[in-house]
């Protein structure tokens, strides 16, 4: 499922506030421990979530609150500490779960995409995208 609101942020806002970023420094994908074990994914491992439309990299959080064979991704991620110039654009596409939905398929009443879930694959990766909290502090101020 996609679009879970993150309690420490307001949608995509406040990633540049050091104290909030310390509470939730990386984009997470929640996965049931049984599913994770079956796929060889361990808690805290970076994962590639993908389908025929695109991919996103998120960090695994094992939790029994998600049903087996279902994953739940946080939304709204971008990295204000990174380069904002095109094509990088603050890393907005690296961990954007909306990469996995088809573009330009909108609801009849507006321009919002009517997707709350999508078929996808998930695999562990050896890549490391952990947030450098020292960089956050240097760029945006002390952690308080």
Where are these regions (language model features)?
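Long, low-complexity segments enriched in small/aliphatic residues
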Residues: 1-16
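Long, contiguous, secondary-structure-rich segments that constitute the structural scaffold
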Residues: 15-144
